[in-house]
Amino acid sequence: MLNTENYEFWFVTGSQSLYGEETLRSVEKDAKEIVEKLNASHQLPYPIVFKLVATTADNITKVMKEANYNDHVAGVITWMHTFSPAKNWIRGTKLLQKPLLHLATQFLNKIPYDTIDFDYMNLNQSAHGDREYAFINARLRKNNKIISGYWGDEDVQKAMAKWMDVAVAYNESFKIKVVTFADKMRNVAVTDGDKVEAQIKFGWTVDYWGVGDLVAEVNAVSEADIDAKYADLQKEYDFVEGQNTPEKFEHNVKYQIREYFGLKKFMDDRGYTAFTTNFEDLVGLEQLPGLAAQLLMAEGYGFAGEGDWKTAALDRLLKIMAHNEKTVFMEDYTLDLRQGHEAILGSHMLEVDPSIASDKPRVEVHPLDIGDKDDPARLVFTGMQGDAVDVTMADYGDEFKLMSYDVRGNKPEADTPHLPVAKQLWTPKQGLREGAVGWLTVGGGHHTVLSFAVDSEQLQDLSHLFDLTYVNIK
């Protein structure tokens, strides 16, 4: 997968000097134990670093500034061991530009009825401190996440892990650079949008480059690199020549490998992590990138067809959140409207990420009527079963909106011998009819990101961080 920062999260424990040094030492000891055991749980995707017991406005402000300035810090986790006067948190919290998690927990998960006294109550008053602290976050309109429960429980740790993935995706969003080779497909509305506003709101840089600049990189790829990659792919996938001569099959597959290396070098040299192509502008290329795009998506690059830079950036963003697992560019195509069989068949002309393949992908070469170029090689496979979210983004003039619904992924009821593309079947969980009406009413697009590794709660959390309107169609 494309590399991201080696992120960590800082743990800040709230208290106050009123309780004395002995109590504060106990607070620090307990906080360090929580951090140590959370890191040892193997439930969290990123490490937590204990920073301090925060007792004054000055030390709170200082640590929040430090979190901002350290690029490897993805967010701050706060816990109120005791009561912590919330006015102390105002300045630092206002300055904090990283995601914030309020962990509403307690060091012990029970009340020691036989031994409890007021010293114990003073030390273990998270329920008291949580309410004071949560008020100031709400008063500041902080858009922070709150997770409540015992820190040692697996469900709480899994909730923290999901939030960590959201926080990292948020940080990485401001590094996403999309290259569009040619403009978007002519006369299409939903794939258009305000690139300046996208950079202001999400941090996305979107640059146009002419196809000729890509062609130069493609033509410069060495035969040795192509031959080596061809041999590697023969080990990983089934090669099916079909109606092609052996010479034509090998040539067309190797040309996609040439495009793969050309695209990869072009992006890596310039810092791009997502890209779009357009079948209307392929001057100088023999084929529309198919297998090439699929191989790059499998490595974590974002992609969308027809110049759809929003979906390409969203694809990259959700791949980061999902650790590049089971998260793919997708398009709604054909419906099964029979009662009891309701489903959407999703695919694209060529470019569906093999991370959702339920069978061994096959490398095949077939004609493509669109684009007026040579027959492109592509990976052909059937998608998977399971719970997923289907996500899209559109620009409505006055705002961007993120939209999704929960779906159930299924396999087709029968083979499709005349459909030589990757395909995925799914049904909205609220029903095909209800889901379609909800999607169409809000104006959801035909290009989406389908993920079996991200859920709607994470999309809601991400939208809060961006102050982005999120429509969860139910």
From Swiss-Prot:
Enzyme Commission numbers on file: 5.3.1.4
Q: Which domain of life is it from?
A: Bacteria
Q: Give the keywords, sorted.
A: Arabinose catabolism, Carbohydrate metabolism, Isomerase, Manganese, Metal-binding
What is the gene name?
araA
Q: How is the cofactor bound?
A: Binds 1 Mn(2+) ion per subunit.
The record's family statement is: Belongs to the arabinose isomerase family.
Alphabetical list of Gene3D superfamilies matching this protein: 3.40.50.10940
Name of the featured protein? L-arabinose isomerase
GO BP term, pick one: L-arabinose catabolic process to xylulose 5-phosphate
As its record notes, the protein acts as a catalyst of: beta-L-arabinopyranose = L-ribulose
Q: In which pathway does it act?
A: Carbohydrate degradation; L-arabinose degradation via L-ribulose; D-xylulose 5-phosphate from L-arabinose (bacterial route): step 1/3
Q: Which PANTHER family match?
A: L-ARABINOSE ISOMERASE
Judged by the first EC level, this protein's enzyme class is isomerase
Q: Which Pfam families match?
A: AraA_central, AraA_N, Arabinose_Iso_C
Question: What does the protein in this record do?
Answer: Catalyzes the conversion of L-arabinose to L-ribulose.
Q: Which GO terms describe its cellular component?
A: cytosol
Is Metal-binding a UniProt keyword of this protein? yes
Give the Gene Ontology MF terms in alphabetical order.
Answer: L-arabinose isomerase activity; manganese ion binding
Question: What cofactor does this one take?
Answer: Mn(2+)
Task: Name the residues that bind Mn(2+).
Answer: E306, E331, H348, H447
